[in-house]
Each structure stands twice: as C-alpha cells, then as structure tokens.
From Swiss-Prot:
This is Protein-S-isoprenylcysteine O-methyltransferase. The keyword Magnesium does not apply. NCBIfam families: isopcys_mtase. It holds the Pfam family ICMT. GO terms for biological process: methylation. Changing residue 126 to A: Abolishes FTA methylation.
Length: 194
C-alpha cells in the first residue's frame, strides 16, 4: 500500500481519537476537583507523552524529518495494527462512557467521585492505560517509524510506572477497603486470571 495511504489512515484514526477524548473530556471537566495530586515532575511527563503520542506521529505524517527512521514494515503487519487501532478506539469510547464524569487527565478526586466497577471496569482497574499502551505501539507500527514507536513506548512507560502507584494510593485513600477489595478482584491492565 502507498505510504501516503497509511498516513491518511493514521490521521483518520487520530482525528476520531481526539474527537472521542474531546467529547467525553469536556463533559468530565465540568465536575469540580475535590482533591488533586500533582507532583511537579508530572507536568514534564505529560509533556513528554504529548511529544510521543501527538507531536512525533504528526511530524512523521506531515514532514520528512523522521523519514530516515522508517522501518519498512510489511503491509500485513501495518494492516493488523490498523485493525487493532480501530478496535482500540472502540475500547477507548467504551472506557470513557463507563467512566462518565469520573475521568480526569490528572490525578484527582472530583466532587461526587464514584468508584467505577461496572462495564469494562468490572474486570480491569486501568483500561484507559491498557488502551494507551496499545495506542503508542500501534501508531508506531502504522507509521512504520522507529522514533514514533520507541519514543512513544518509552515516554508512556515512564509516566505509567510513576503514575499508577500514586493513582492507586489516592484511590485507596478515598475509597478505603472498597478499593482494596476491588484490587483483589481485578487486574491492572488485563482481566485477572484466577
């Protein structure tokens, strides 16, 4: 398949992804914050992820600066990644729908915050993070570019491994034994195998 066609496919998926986040994110942002945990370095990590999930992929699409890092992956692998991305956007939409107004881009507890344990959250505590792992991997494969793939994965891994323990600590503080019990029944990124 023509390289420009892959770029168009990626842009279509990217626009849908941004649209879903905008629709649900705007609704969720209307809820006021009750408690925020914002370590100083987290802004830097979020910015690093912006570079990995937005800036570099769009640079790969709209310029030739990263062309020397192209991988030349077979179309079959890129097509598989595109299908996974399409399904992953469906997952992303479901995650946002299940979370409702409880979603936040930062670590915070909102007024009226509820512990969501229904829908996809019945079996997985952090499906949004599972989605983002898939996103950074598949965008690098679709665009067939080492920089997009590796930078996206590394930037996301750093944020993920620093943020998740702090997020779970915040949720234990807010929901106590209910969250601890929930942790025992669910997996972080995948359903728990008993």
């Amino acid at each position: 398949m023509n390289e420009n066609l892959w770029k168009i496919c990626f842009i279509v998926m990217f626009i849908i992804w941004v649209f879903v986040r905008k629709v649900y994110g705007t609704r969720a942002m209307k809820n006021k914050s009750k408690k925020k945990v914002r370590p100083n370095f987290e802004k830097s990590l979020v910015f690093l992820n912006f570079i990995g999930m937005v800036f570099l992929p769009l640079t790969a699409v709209f310029s030739s600066y990263l062309d020397s890092f192209n991988i030349n992956l077979p179309d079959s692998i890129r097509l598989f990644a595109l299908i996974v991305t399409f399904l992953n956007i469906g997952l992303f939409t479901k995650i946002h729908k299940d979370l409702g107004n409880n979603w936040s881009a930062i670590l915070e507890i909102k007024d009226g915050h509820k512990l969501v344990k229904e829908g996809i959250y019945k079996n997985i505590r952090h499906p949004m993070y599972a989605h983002l792992w898939l996103w950074v991997i598949t965008q690098g494969i679709i665009l067939s570019n080492w920089v997009v793939l590796i930078f996206g994965i590394v930037a996301w891994a750093i944020l993920y491994f620093i943020r998740v323990p702090k997020e779970e600590e915040l949720l234990i503080e807010e929901f106590g034994d209910e969250y601890i019990e929930y942790m025992g029944k669910t997996g972080r990124l995948f359903p728990k195998v008993v």
